[in-house]
Amino acid sequence: MGKAVKETRYCKVLRQAKIRDNDVAYGIEKIFVKDLNQEEIRFVYFKDTIRMEEQLVARPLDLPEDDLIRLMELSIKQNVFSKEFVGKLKDILDK
């Protein structure tokens, strides 16, 4: 496990791909959940608030398909997903 992008009590953010759109940002992260001792993929939504820029919002991420494609492409380029995952995804799409 490499150096964390960010660390909280809950997890370490190992890798992150994020797209900014005015006062919000959305992304995909590879995280290490401390209590479960496992890596997971997390879809995230951030909003600028008075307290801080890009505060994590605890809600589902809703995106138009075009934005999801952009985010998936960026996540693949920034190695958020493992090569094994990308290969399996490619196999599904090739069927």
Give residue spans per PLM region:
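Mixed-charge, Lys/Arg-enriched low-complexity segments
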Residues: 49-95
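Negatively charged, low-complexity tracts enriched in Asp/Glu with abundant Ser/Thr
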Residues: 1-25
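Weak global preference for isoleucine
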Residues: 13, 19, 28-31, 41, ...
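A short, structured beta-strand/loop element
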Residues: 24-59
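Secondary-structure boundary/capping motif
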Residues: 12-14, 38-40, 62
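Short linear sequence motifs
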Residues: 3, 19, 36-39, 74, ...
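Short non-domain terminal segments
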Residues: 8, 30, 41-44, 79, ...
